[in-house]
């Protein structure tokens, strides 16, 4: 009987990616199979996030529930990973001595040996160090779980925004070698993946070492990923305005695999607040990037992150943010009230804003963005959209769920054999969080792929000079 593993994941897409790698690693090393039932599990892993308020208390509440299971089943192994583990490792060890393994985002590759060690030595076993990019060298071959996949291309952040814990919990920016990234994506493409989402805390800061000692830029990597057979869509998360350079914008002009949707966090529209946040750009500089992007790709839609109620934020500062939101015409946003993160400079900034004012500002911001998003959705009504079918609809298992380039979910009627394929649908209805469509054509009617024989390829590239000497270009 196989051993069972439960992984509970909180936080960003990087954490989702890390959790999938934990599952692959423990399956390859020890045969663990995933379960969603805590009572069945032999190993319980909590992959934590420290971005939001009360993250630590949330962790201890969950651990308390798992302690009850461990009291009944003493052999179960409890592990805590992620950013809270890095930030609060010693505190977890003191407050929850029943935890067996404590590991950080950069040491998850050691999980099999740490679990084994915890079963023979006195627990807990803890490793929350930052061993550069070593973890990727120790992970098994990636396993595709559908037509889309996340691929981490870099780790950490070197920006040190005053409100953010990421540099302290994931370390400074380190890029994976270019060949490693391309090989992982090629493996996923061989398993049927059609869309990849390149991940990093500042993904456009990617500077990947190449085998010849040169450095691969993010723009170069995007074009290389687009050239991998089978990969038809590329997304990336999350980018930073400071490194959103013209060479990246140029990729939008000549690489159709790169979707017409971008998440580019700005946090505030006030230059004064941006300075206090240690964000090295102004609102005008941000809008300049957007103008260049829309010149390169007129139909691109933009989402962003916003922090409301940052210490010292005045009504004028907030109105500057609202003006930026309307000027850029954001399609989507992730917006939150500022919550101080222990150990960050902003945690010590005085703030005299009432909670009521913060909530009112957040509501106004979210309503404005939601209104803009609904307008974009309504513009799609009666249009044909090419969508990637991800699986059964979450609302009706007899229907299919697909995703547009601009990141909207479309539910429509279709057969299960369309899962993993591109189809064209006509948008027939618009809802707050999804669209409804009718199937127009399937992939076999699209001519997405053209098969050319070697003879045809040579004939296509054959050139003769004036002497009749033939040459062939690759």
From Swiss-Prot:
CDD domains, A to Z: Radical_SAM
| EC numbers | 2.8.4.3
Residue ranges of every copy of the Radical SAM core domain listed in the record: 143-375
> Which chemical reaction does it catalyze?
N(6)-dimethylallyladenosine(37) in tRNA + (sulfur carrier)-SH + AH2 + 2 S-adenosyl-L-methionine = 2-methylsulfanyl-N(6)-dimethylallyladenosine(37) in tRNA + (sulfur carrier)-H + 5'-deoxyadenosine + L-methionine + A + S-adenosyl-L-homocysteine + 2 H(+)
Q: How is the cofactor bound?
A: Binds 2 [4Fe-4S] clusters. One cluster is coordinated with 3 cysteines and an exchangeable S-adenosyl-L-methionine.
Which cell locations does it reside in? Cytoplasm
Main location, first listed in the record: cytoplasm
- Record InterPro entries: Elp3/MiaA/NifB-like_rSAM, Methylthiotransferase, Methylthiotransferase_CS, Methylthiotransferase_N, Methylthiotransferase_N_sf, MiaB_methiolase, rSAM, rSAM_horseshoe
Q: Provide the cofactor list for this protein.
A: [4Fe-4S] cluster
Residues annotated to bind [4Fe-4S] cluster 2: 157, 161, 164
Cellular component GO terms, alphabetical: cytosol
What residues does the TRAM domain cover? Answer: 378-441
Spans traversing the lipid bilayer: none
**Residue ranges constituting the MTTase N-terminal domain according to the UniProt record:** 3-120
Described by its record, this protein's role is as follows: Catalyzes the methylthiolation of N6-(dimethylallyl)adenosine (i(6)A), leading to the formation of 2-methylthio-N6-(dimethylallyl)adenosine (ms(2)i(6)A) at position 37 in tRNAs that read codons beginning with uridine.
The UniProt subunit note reads as follows: Monomer.
Q: What is this protein called?
A: tRNA-2-methylthio-N(6)-dimethylallyladenosine synthase
Q: Which species?
A: Vibrio campbellii (strain ATCC BAA-1116)
């Amino acid at each position: 009987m196989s051993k069972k593993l439960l992984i509970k994941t909180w936080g960003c897409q990087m954490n989702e990616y890390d959790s999938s790698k934990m599952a692959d690693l423990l399956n390859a090393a020890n045969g663990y199979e995933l379960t969603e039932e805590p009572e069945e599990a032999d190993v319980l892993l909590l992959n934590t996030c420290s971005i939001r308020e009360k993250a630590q208390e949330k962790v201890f509440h969950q651990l308390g529930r798992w302690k009850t299971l461990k009291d009944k089943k003493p052999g179960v192994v409890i592990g805590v990973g992620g950013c809270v583990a890095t930030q609060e490792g010693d505190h977890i060890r003191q407050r929850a001595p029943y935890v067996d393994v404590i590991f950080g985002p950069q040491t998850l590759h050691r999980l099999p040996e740490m679990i084994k060690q915890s079963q023979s030595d006195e627990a807990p076993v803890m490793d929350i160090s930052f061993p550069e990019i070593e973890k990727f060298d120790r992970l098994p071959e990636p396993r595709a779980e559908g037509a889309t996949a996340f691929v981490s291309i870099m780790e950490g952040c070197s920006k040190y925004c005053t409100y953010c814990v990421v540099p302290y919990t994931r370390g400074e920016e380190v890029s994976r070698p270019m060949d490693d990234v391309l090989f992982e994506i090629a493996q996923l493409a061989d398993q049927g993946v059609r869309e990849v989402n390149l991940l990093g805390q500042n993904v456009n800061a990617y500077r990947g070492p190449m085998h010849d000692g040169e450095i691969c830029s993010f723009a170069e990597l995007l074009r290389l990923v687009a050239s991998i057979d089978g990969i038809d869509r590329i997304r990336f998360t999350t980018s930073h305005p400071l490194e959103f350079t013209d060479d990246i914008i140029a990729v939008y002009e000549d690489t159709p695999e790169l979707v017409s949707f971008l998440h580019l966090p700005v946090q505030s529209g006030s230059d004064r607040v941006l300075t206090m946040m240690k964000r090295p750009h102004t609102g005008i500089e941000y809008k300049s990037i957007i103008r260049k992007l829309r010149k390169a790709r007129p139909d691109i839609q933009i989402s962003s992150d916003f922090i409301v109620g940052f210490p010292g934020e005045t009504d004028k500062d907030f109105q500057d943010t609202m003006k930026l939101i309307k000027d850029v015409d954001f399609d989507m946003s992730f917006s939150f009230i500022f919550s101080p993160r222990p150990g960050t400079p902003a945690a010590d900034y005085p703030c005299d804003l009432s909670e009521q004012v913060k909530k009112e500002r957040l509501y106004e911001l979210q309503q404005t963005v939601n209104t803009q998003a609904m307008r974009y959705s309504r513009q799609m009504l009666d249009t044909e959209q090419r969508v990637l079918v991800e699986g059964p609809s979450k609302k009706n298992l007899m229907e299919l769920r697909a995703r547009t380039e601009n990141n909207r979910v479309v539910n429509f009627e279709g057969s299960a054999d369309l899962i993993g394929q591109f189809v064209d649908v006509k948008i027939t209805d618009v809802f707050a969080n999804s669209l409804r469509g009718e199937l127009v054509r399937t992939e076999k009617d699209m001519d997405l792929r053209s098969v050319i024989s070697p003879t045809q390829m040579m004939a296509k590239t054959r050139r003769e000079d004036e002497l009749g000497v033939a040459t062939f270009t690759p």
